[in-house]
Amino acid sequence: HEEWQLLRNLGLKNPPHPILGRYKWPGIYTPFKHQLTTAAFLAANPRCYCLSEPGTGKTNASAWAADYLLTKKLVKRVLVVCPVSIMDTAWRADLFRTLMHRSVGIASGTKRQREAVIAADYEFVIINFDGVKVVHQALMAGGFDLVIIDEATSVKNAQTERWKALNAICKPGVRVWAMTGTPAAQSPLDAYGLAKLVRPESVPRSYTQWRDRVMVKITQFKWTPHANSKDMVREVLQPAIRYTKEECLDLPDLLYTTRELELSPQQKKYYEQVKTHMVALAAGEEITAANAATLINKLAQIAQGAVYADTGEVIQFDIKDRLAELMEVVNSTDHKVLVFVPYRHVSDMLRDALAEELGDPHAVEVIRGGVPATQRADIIKRFQTEDKTKVLLLAPAAAGHGITLTRADQIVWWGPTTSVELYIQCNARAHRAGQTNKVTVTHLQSSP
């Protein structure tokens, strides 16, 4: 590593990084070519961005790079900051499969529980964004000299307490790698918070100065992006590495991921009531396949956001966290998104919520039982040939066979289906002949 650093100091622009020749690449996965390049890039740049598309294996590439730095004693301890939904299913699980020789702790739960994890001697500590401000002092004293920020657009706003708490931990001398596939998806203004966190010298001191640089004032309250705003964003978010899924030629065509979510307090209450009823049945009455299926159905409905009460009315639950996860997927792609929703009342609720989030009722369409064949054909045609529809909500049973929806490169399962055949068939709506992109299947999971 010292020889490589010397070559860089002498002005050699891109000497091959020693990770490519001397590192053993532990774990159950063989790294893809783009992951080798990404890991070398991260190891070479103390403050940088990995802007590769979702599904390209950023987690493992950064894990290998961090492990290399730990092995060379260039860093002592790693803090991973990411959304709650991927703390366990993505980060802990991938670190276990990739770096089984390293110790990993998840700082979750109460303040005291989080502090105990930070005070222990785990080499990797994983924490969610809002947890950072809860145990801010403990993190400051925790000896973290590498901070990996995953889904970094969660801290795009430099005015928030969340951003300020994280910024204090990313003090001079600490390595910071920010990872996101969508650095300024909504607006060039979004790049400011990221740049100020990773390389503050790359942007003006004030947000107003940045706004005046990348936006043009139309009226007193309306601004529009400057014609060169994309170039300006690219300029400040450097050094950066980015791969699209299509550039990763050795990636499988169909990728799977799971995002874990907490149930809301109201959902937990109803969920426990139904479970208690099931236990009571098991203790006394005879359980038939029919009443067992009904109760399991009820649990699935509660987890997904709306349930039929015995009176026939629909009880709706707070789905803002689940919706936020879905919107992250929607915003992560320039293409379209299929969302499989098993229950009619949930799809009604979701259609309205998505239309509001996207600011256009025509951006969301629904196919399910009861939609006439001619209307269904029109929806599919519009989805495949026009740009207006961004999200298509589908009942799995209504979309299992024969439909081509290859304009989508993201599939989200809002809730599970009990039929493996139906699951495979539904995923094949997008992953089929005519698909020119790699397809990612995301499972939203929130049952306790």
Q: Where on the chain are the PLM-derived regions?
A:
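Conserved pre-motif I regulatory segment
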Residues: 15-51
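Conserved Walker A/P-loop ATP-binding site and its immediately adjacent core
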Residues: 61, 74-95, 185-190, 343-344
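Conserved two-lobed SF2 helicase motor
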Residues: 120-135, 385-400
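Conserved helix-turn-beta segment of the N-terminal RecA-like "Helicase ATP-binding" lobe
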Residues: 86-110, 198-201, 357-358
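Inter-lobe coupling linker of SF2 helicases/translocases
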Residues: 126-131, 137-141, 161-174, 178-179, ...
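Conserved helicase ATPase core of P-loop NTP-dependent helicases/translocases
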Residues: 113-116, 338-340, 348-349, 355, ...
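SF2 helicase/translocase ATPase core recognition
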Residues: 174-208, 248-275, 394-448
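Walker A/P-loop
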Residues: 45-65
